[in-house]
């Protein structure tokens, strides 16, 4: 069966590190990389941050590229947080259409570890502490859809 791997975790949980460590860059679609390419950076009180201004276009583009890859039967990894159950809906539609299994790699990291990693990031890639805490709470309470297979 053809495989779609969805990475699932809060910012700083190790998703991008996992991609590099496993040499998956050529198979990966990253919402943050598309944000940088489309909208660049914004200035915040702490310096540069990845712009969220074109988020709708970012996701439209990501889904277009993903569908093209799935039409061709290619293994694909999607690097984004995927914190809400509804975040998986489009993947389900495409998986059903093209005969893919959906696999989810969860990055379950403590809040202390997330905050430490955030502090060590480049300034443009840092997130405010309150945002990390909120995203962590959402992740902790998340129920994944029953049509995905969780892998370790």
Place the predicted regions along the sequence by residue:
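Short N-terminal micro-motifs specific to bacterial/archaeal maturation
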Residues: 1, 25, 49, 53, ...
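Conserved substrate/cofactor phosphate-moiety recognition/catalytic segment
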Residues: 16-74, 113-116
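Charge-rich, low-complexity amphipathic helices
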Residues: 41, 84, 91-92, 113, ...
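Glycine-rich phosphate-binding loop used to anchor ATP phosphates in small-molecule kinases
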Residues: 52-102
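Conserved GTP-binding G-domain of TRAFAC-class P-loop NTPases and closely related GTPase folds
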Residues: 1-8, 13-17, 21, 25-27, ...
């Amino acid at each position: 069966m053809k495989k779609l791997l969805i990475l699932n975790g809060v910012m700083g949980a190790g998703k991008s590190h996992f991609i590099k460590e496993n040499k998956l860059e050529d198979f990966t679609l990253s919402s943050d990389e598309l944000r940088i390419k489309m909208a660049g950076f914004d200035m915040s009180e702490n310096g540069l941050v990845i712009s969220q201004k074109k988020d709708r276009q970012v996701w439209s583009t990501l889904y277009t590229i993903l569908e093209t890859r799935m039409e061709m039967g290619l293994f694909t990894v999607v690097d984004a947080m995927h914190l809400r159950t509804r975040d998986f809906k489009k993947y389900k539609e495409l998986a059903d259409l093209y005969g893919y299994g959906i696999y989810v790699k969860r990055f379950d990291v403590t809040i202390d570890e997330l905050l430490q990693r955030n502090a060590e990031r480049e300034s443009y890639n840092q997130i405010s502490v309150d945002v990390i805490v909120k995203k962590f709470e959402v992740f902790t309470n998340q129920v994944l859809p029953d049509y995905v297979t969780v892998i370790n």
